[in-house]
Amino acid sequence: MASNRIELFKQMLSSDPGNTTVMFGLAKEYEKSGQDSELIETLNRYIEASDDEGNAFGMLASAYERIGQRDQAKAAYQRGVETAQRHGHPGHRRQPRQGDL
């Protein structure tokens, strides 16, 4: 079932490669199906193309953590905190705890 949704998002993205809503939807499907490498690649493209307010960075950091790339996870968390602050989201200002990484 998830693979059908992934294929649908990929088809939509192929006809509109800059559609950040579709990119984020594809990333969520990769996250649900545990495809961390694809998730990381898609989120990095999404972050470059969008004005994300911080949520994608948390997803990205979690994916990096799952594959053991702690330095990249820490950097993604930090970028997420900085981005959330720029957008005025105080709930996202928390620095990751030591155990988070």
Predicted regions and their residues:
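TPR/TPR-like (Sel1-like) alpha-helical repeat modules
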Residues: 70-89, 101
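Conserved structural position within tetratricopeptide repeats
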Residues: 11-14, 44-48, 82
